[in-house]
């Protein structure tokens, strides 16, 4: 009989601040799923981690009077320790600043680029730093983000796009 496999991951969290109830809730749900599948005898891999490459992290480091790497290292330790204290049963904790993560992403990117699945194009939009997202004009009220009440940055930048339409 083939042993069933189950993979669960949380979002990789921004480390601009300490974990909060929302991040705990998401991680707890993933932990419950992982434990349930382990109880059923399935082979489980549960991944969580931190995204240390965001504008929010840069701003938080600046506000704390620290270099970005120093700040994200400190915050990543807090996130890892929090999950340990809460007995989260993850099998791995990945940080986007780790060599292994960067090598894996580079390898994946290179493969899809070679297949022609990645192409360069121009993206024009309104970027809200607070939301860490691009907004449309319809998302704005009086030219401001509805959530943060701030004017988003008008950005035009060259980006890489994934040709998802090939995989319909």
Label every PLM stretch briefly:
Residues 2-168:
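N-terminal, positively charged nucleic-acid-binding surface of large information/translation enzymes
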């Amino acid at each position: 009989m083939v042993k069933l496999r189950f993979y669960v991951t949380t979002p990789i969290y921004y480390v601009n601040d300490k974990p909060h109830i929302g991040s705990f809730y998401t991680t707890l749900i993933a932990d419950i799923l992982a434990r349930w599948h382990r109880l059923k005898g399935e082979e489980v891999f549960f991944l969580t981690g931190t995204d240390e490459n965001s504008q929010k992290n840069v701003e938080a480091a600046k506000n704390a009077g620290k270099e970005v790497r120093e700040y994200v290292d400190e915050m990543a330790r807090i996130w890892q320790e929090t999950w340990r204290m809460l007995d989260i049963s993850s099998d791995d904790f990945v940080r986007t600043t780790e060599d292994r993560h960067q090598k894996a992403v580079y390898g994946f990117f290179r493969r899809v680029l070679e297949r022609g699945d990645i192409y360069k194009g121009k993206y024009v939009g309104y970027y809200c730093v607070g939301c860490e997202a691009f907004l449309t004009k319809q998302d704005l009220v009086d030219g401001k983000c509805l959530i943060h009440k701030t004017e988003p940055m008008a950005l035009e930048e060259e980006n890489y796009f994934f040709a998802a339409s090939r995989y319909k």
